[in-house]
Amino acid sequence: MAIVPKRKTSKQRKRLRRSHHALDIQNLVKCSNCSQKIQQHRTCMFCGFYKNKKVEGFQARNDR
């Protein structure tokens, strides 16, 4: 036989358990080359620069 819960999980307890599942807000910074907002520690998708250096083999987006 399988184990069965002793009591029904209340709405409050269920929601408190899920309160840690929320997504975090992204931390955006300005690109040092083109001043667009980008995520930290990522290559700029608009100009292809990372830490003031051009990343080789990176295809920058031109749609914006």
UniProtKB/Swiss-Prot annotation:
Name under which the protein is recorded: Large ribosomal subunit protein bL32
GO molecular function, one term: structural constituent of ribosome
SUPFAM superfamilies with a match to the protein in the record: Zn-binding ribosomal proteins
Gene name as annotated: rpmF
Superkingdom of the source species: Bacteria
Taxon lineage: Bacteria, Bacillati, Mycoplasmatota, Mycoplasmoidales, Metamycoplasmataceae
UniProt xrefs under Pfam families: Ribosomal_L32p
Signal peptide range in chain numbering: none
Family per record: Belongs to the bacterial ribosomal protein bL32 family.
InterPro entries: Ribosomal_bL32, Ribosomal_bL32_bact, Ribosomal_zn-bd
A Gene Ontology biological process term: translation
Record's keyword terms, sorted: Ribonucleoprotein, Ribosomal protein
